[in-house]
Amino acid sequence: MTVLSVSYSLAHVSRRTAGGAEQVLATLDEALVRAGHRSLVLAPAGSRCEGLLIPAQVPTGILDDEAKCEARRAFKKLLDRALNDYTVDIVHMHGLDFIHYMPQCDLPIVVSLHLPLSWYDLEALRRVQSNETLVCVSDAQAQTAPRDLRVDAVITNGVDLSRFHPRQNKSNYVLAISRICAEKGVHLAIDAAERAGVELIIAGSVFGYSEHLDYFESMIRPRLNEHIHFVGLVGGGHKANLMSGARCLLAPCLAPETSSLVAMEALASGTPVIAFPNGALSEIVIPGQTGFLVNRSEEMADAIREVDSLSPTACRHEAEARFSSERMFGEYMDLYRSLLASQNVALLAAA
């Protein structure tokens, strides 16, 4: 089987990136190659994948409307060329802006909706063709779909459990890992840590959108000190060590989370999650067992004081039961095979 995966037009794909959609794409790409399939990945130049990268030259720096349009044009041109140059069985779209470069073809097209449905062009989603399959990444996300929007499947994201290892003896810091932007509520994590009197390590990327840059400069940088640290993007062993050593992960997200890979990674590391109950976070965290769900930074501070009562082993067991990348890959493979079988039946009927 040959799968052509298409990223968001302005986000690099790798296992180290801050974006959940890009991490999922990278995980599926690696699993496809490991299973003996052919994986093609259309993504911005500089992305890292196990399959064949089809690199798009897209703008860097300030990501304004002009940059978005330029990136989409580049993706559209490369995607059309790739479908002409390669024999592809499945096209899998991952980007928020996929509608701007959706290929006009008869191949099965899977669209994973990684972000809140309200962020997409809903009218365009309502006009999906019969060969296009819309996938939500959590039940919480699917439940937000308007009645007239067809959601074809729900496949919960997963993480590579082998990269994370629990520690029974935790260090004395709490952790926040996310994109550094207002909807992730990083400033509220700082509020909670200061109120609880604990050290906070903040990790993640500040993307080149003006509102993200302004948020970091006005709301985060002025509050950094010997107790509040910003370490930037982390990955690999550094990320795994930070995760396993933390007393807990703070996730005060203000937007409805469609998924949360970082919360799944924390549980895989034996680290409880204290989160606002927005979207899928309320599905991931089991209050009193693998973390706490709170509504304000003051409650988050109180929960930090109680988090040492939770079992790292229970957190790990929950990750193993529900959030493995193997389970996610298996469900996508089942979907791919089902779509190809349906296509073959339709071709035979038309013959």
Language model segments and positions:
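Catalytic cores of nucleotide-sugar-dependent glycosyltransferases that transfer UDP/GDP/TDP-activated
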Residues: M1-A351
